[in-house]
């Protein structure tokens, strides 16, 4: 059997890029003399969320539980300060959008209440006011479960949410596992049935969700013209959204990059160059949990994780594409320059599933997990200046 499901097959073409010795030196990670180093987060921090209000960074949830922390970037010597605890249930993979000086936190994966017996795709929403240091649960629910979702804003007044798992299928998987109890045969059957499906059969969200806080209402921003993704990275450049990679089914990522431009009330999408391989001459498997942002009109993508060999198994007809494969965390940093991706340098360590916050012409990477899933508290700043990557 050669190829199954060609409509999902990623064209894993290899691109040979020759670098001179001088070019290799130029793309090496150099200290950024214009940036002040930020202190570590007080706790090992991964699968959380966060945002930036004026000159302060806010992060919380994930491995921090219900805790949230604030760093005044004008007074970094004071370190991270604890703010009010999140009033809802602990959760991972929530998303945050800053609108009119307030943090709006949506969804994630966790229990609906303290007595719940399993985790679920959550659809609730909360607002944090930095001026009063108070949280409020909003009287609304997202139209979809929000796990693996990404979120941003185009105008500072409304949130745009993209992608994520199908709540019924996701929740059902954990329900079925719980029902199997200690019966290993039943558990194995549940696991194989869940992972042994084509990408389209997971029904990842393709609806563009727009939340208007003034009306406390949700509306449609159109439909993605491609398979929904989970764990993508997202950046905003002017009035455009850049959606980068993500998984199209559990364990199988895509190298695709898309640009969304608001036309009227909907986003219209155009394909961008696929992300290149992590090494010269290698194919890109696609990334989930990567960091991204903009520096001097250049899109930067860093870290993330995948299962090398998953596409090879999938194209041989093995729908459980990552079965038997080892998850790999990455440290490469990519830059989109003149509409072409290049390998710009490397992070200090392999890293993914942290928080990306857009700074003034820099990308702030907060926390994340490194090889083996170990949480880190490090804060790293990336910028692109003079055709070079700078890391602080």
From Swiss-Prot:
Q: Where are the Kelch repeats?
A: 56-100, 102-155, 157-192, 193-238, 241-290, 312-361, 363-392
Q: Would you name any one GO CC term?
A: periplasmic space
Which UniProt keywords are present, listed alphabetically? Carbohydrate metabolism, Isomerase, Kelch repeat, Periplasm, Repeat, Signal
Where is the secretion signal located?
Answer: 1-35
Q: Which SUPFAM superfamilies match?
A: Kelch motif (SSF117281)
Q: Which Pfam families match?
A: NANM
GO MF: racemase and epimerase activity, acting on carbohydrates and derivatives
Q: Which family does it belong to?
A: Belongs to the NanM family.
Which reaction is the catalytic activity of this chain?
A: N-acetyl-alpha-neuraminate = N-acetyl-beta-neuraminate
The record's listing under HAMAP family reads: NanM
Q: What assembly does the database describe for this protein?
A: Homodimer.
**Which EC number(s) does UniProt give?**
5.1.3.24
Protein's recorded name: N-acetylneuraminate epimerase
Q: Where is the active site?
A: 247 (proton acceptor)
